[in-house]
UniProtKB/Swiss-Prot annotation:
Name of this chain's protein: Porphobilinogen deaminase
PROSITE patterns recorded: PORPHOBILINOGEN_DEAM (PS00533)
Lineage: Bacteria, Pseudomonadati, Campylobacterota, Epsilonproteobacteria, Campylobacterales
Record field: catalytic activity: 4 porphobilinogen + H2O = hydroxymethylbilane + 4 NH4(+)
Cofactor: dipyrromethane
Keyword Iron-sulfur: no
Gene, per the UniProt record: hemC
Oligomer status and interactors: Monomer.
């Protein structure tokens, strides 16, 4: 293979991610040419509707997957938190790269800390997971749907539409945005549990031995273990990328620390768990935790959450 083609969304963050993988591939494989093929996904085009109301899985991945299945491209680079837990026939999750900062952060032009936000402050996010946890901490907040790429969200913040917005620290760091805003307040994981796979890049590829061989060096053992726990948890709960589920696993030596939360978008009802498991249990602990949540009513709670989101 002389040319490897990467399917990519056209946002600044998506292009950064694809360029990052392109550079690593070319450094690893002398003589390999790598091209980016830009395209728009459903999630990029429909910007006037909250993601949960658009419905379906793979809002930011389907068009990229179609291009791989048609032979137009060979791989796609995603924020792993946007990658569905099930793959179409002929496609595989070929690599999980080393993780960036997994935390969510409050970005504001006026308020330094989350506790500084005034009563009924306007906070922008389209994520039901973030909304759930924000309202659990501060039921008075006015959570407003905020769509668009990172630059669009920052512009709306600076124009005064919001008192604060919520972004992933990984995106802030990758795009070097710290100097563009006045205040960044990263949430503790116990305050705001991240989405599955948050902070990691996932490389999806056609199920072709030659291509998979070129990609496998990108795998990071720690990230593979952590995200396996997280994705197993979400898979068993049958939760997509747009439901209020937070799950984070952190490998520390021979132990895995896990935080998980499932609940209603308004934060009025939640199921939570914090635990420590052995590293050797990483292939089972995510499923076991999901079964515990199901026994505690998580599936019924998620069904109600979906109904609330579609009102």
């Amino acid at each position: 293979m002389k040319i490897l083609k990467i399917a990519t969304r056209k946002s600044a963050l998506a292009l950064w991610q694809s360029e990052h993988i392109k550079a690593r591939l070319m450094a690893q494989h002398a003589g390999l040419q790598v091209e980016l093929v830009g395209m728009k996904t459903k999630g990029d085009v429909i910007l006037d509707t909250p993601l949960a109301k658009i419905g379906g899985k793979g809002l930011f991945t389907k068009e990229l997957e179609d291009s791989m299945l048609s032979g137009q491209t060979h791989i796609a680079v995603h924020s792993l938190k946007d990658v569905p837990v099930a793959f179409l026939d002929g496609l595989v999750l070929a690599a999980i790269c080393s993780r960036e900062d997994v935390r969510d952060a409050m970005i504001s032009q006026r308020y330094v800390k989350f506790d500084d936000l005034p009563q009924s402050a306007k906070v922008g996010t389209t994520s039901l997971r973030r909304k759930m946890q924000l309202l659990r901490m501060r039921p008075d907040l006015n959570i407003i749907s905020l769509r668009g790429n990172v630059q669009t969200r920052l512009r709306k913040l600076k124009e005064g539409e919001f008192d604060a917005i919520i972004l992933a620290m990984a995106g802030i760091n990758r795009l070097n945005l710290a100097d563009e805003v006045a205040h960044i307040y990263p949430f503790d994981i116990a305050q705001m549990t991240p989405a599955m796979g948050q902070g990691a890049l996932g490389v999806e590829a056609v199920d072709d031995a030659q291509i998979l061989e070129k990609i496998k060096f990108l795998n990071d053992e720690r990230s593979v273990i952590e995200t396996r726990v997280e994705r197993d948890f979400v898979t068993l709960l049958e939760g997509g990328c747009q439901v209020p589920i937070g799950i984070n696993a952190r490998l520390a030596s021979e132990e895995i620390e896990i935080n998980a939360i499932v609940g209603l978008p308004d934060g009025s009802e939640v199921i939570t768990e914090n635990l420590t498991a052995k590293k050797s249990e990483f292939e089972s602990v995510g499923k076991e935790l999901a079964r515990e949540f199901i026994a505690r009513g998580a599936k019924e709670l998620l069904k109600r959450a979906e109904e609330m989101a579609n009102l």
